[in-house]
């Protein structure tokens, strides 16, 4: 109701300031014949009116309500949400009006009346409310700080857990690497010992055998030793049995070759490549073990060890 009652005074002040600015612009611009500036009520206020410099006479006039310290009407330009006159008319009529197309809402006239305007108190009340809200937000802020502290503690706990897990993984990886390193050292030492006993050219000029070559050479050496051992077992078994093959069982050519070999060396007949290691007919038949050992005098003494041990 107070704002509705104060409408005529505000309109009079607005029109007075607009008339003063129109008189000042009359000297620079001539009005066309069809334009009448004597009735400013029919014109819409220009949004640039607040940026125009007021006349000296208007500045020297006392403020509204006779207050010499108050600013004259039309000299204050602020950013206001809606025009004062438009809001007053909308409140008094009980309806809403659409804003003008040429007004951008950035600069409006703030008219101060002699009495206290309720709109002047609204920012203060809003400020007080904001202050109260800020005061009320204090405990909430404290709660937010406590929540942040709790989150920080949780993150720190996760960080410590992650660091402990990473340390355990690092220690496990170091143990695995050390065990693998020891295993490779043991394997290299074993291969070096195997190279030392395998009969192959050992000299600084010979390239060191690789692991695969060392294993292949050891395999061939073992097979060769097994074959030699099998042949030696056959010879020892024949010597123990005391069997002799007569010359009639051999062909004439084979008998002649065996006789010639026996004439050169008595021990060559024992290593003929015939089944059962037959002896040549040129050798006298030996029935006892000492006689056999006397015939094969070139064979190692280990073959006739059992003959020497007998009484």
Curated annotation (Swiss-Prot):
CDD domains: bHLH_TS_bHLHe22_bHLHb5. Residues 171-225 form the bHLH domain. GO terms for cellular component: nucleus. Residues 125-147 have a biased composition (Gly residues). Residues 81-96 have a biased composition (Low complexity). InterPro entries: bHLH_dom, bHLH_transcription_factors, HLH_DNA-bd_sf. May act as a transcriptional repressor. The gene is BHLHE22. Its main location: nucleus. It comes from Gallus gallus. This is Class E basic helix-loop-helix protein 22. GO terms for molecular function: DNA-binding transcription factor activity, RNA polymerase II-specific; E-box binding; protein dimerization activity.
């Amino acid at each position: 109701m107070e704002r509705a009652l104060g409408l005529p005074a505000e309109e009079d002040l607005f029109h007075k300031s607009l008339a003063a600015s129109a008189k000042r612009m009359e000297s620079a611009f001539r009005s066309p014949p069809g334009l009448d500036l004597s009735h400013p009520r029919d014109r819409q206020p220009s949004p640039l009116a607040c940026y125009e410099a007021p006349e000296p006479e208007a500045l020297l006039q006392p403020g509204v309500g006779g207050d010499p310290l108050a600013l004259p009407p039309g000299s204050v330009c602020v950013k206001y949400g809606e025009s004062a006159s438009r809001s007053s008319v909308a409140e008094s009529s009980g309806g809403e009006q659409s804003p003008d197309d040429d007004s951008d809402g950035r600069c409006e006239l703030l008219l101060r009346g002699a009495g206290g305007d309720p709109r002047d108190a609204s920012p203060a009340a809003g400020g007080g409310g904001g202050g109260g809200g800020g005061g009320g937000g204090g405990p909430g802020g404290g709660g937010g700080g406590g929540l942040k502290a709790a989150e920080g503690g949780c993150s720190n706990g996760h960080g410590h857990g992650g660091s402990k897990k990473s340390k355990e993984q690092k220690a496990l990886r170091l143990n695995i690497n050390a065990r693998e390193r020891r295993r490779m050292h043991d394997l290299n030492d074993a291969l070096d010992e195997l190279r030392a006993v395998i009969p192959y050219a050992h000299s600084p000029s010979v390239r060191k055998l690789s692991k695969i070559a060392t294993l292949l050479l050891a395999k061939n050496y073992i097979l060769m030793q097994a074959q030699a051992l099998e042949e030696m077992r056959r010879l020892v078994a024949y010597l123990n049995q005391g069997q002799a093959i007569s010359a009639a069982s051999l062909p004439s050519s084979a008998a002649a070759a065996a006789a010639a070999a026996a004439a050169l060396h008595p021990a060559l007949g024992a290593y003929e490549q015939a089944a059962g290691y037959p002896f040549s007919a040129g050798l006298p038949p030996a029935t006892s073990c000492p006689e056999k050992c006397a015939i094969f005098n070139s064979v190692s003494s280990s073959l006739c060890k059992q003959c020497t041990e007998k009484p």
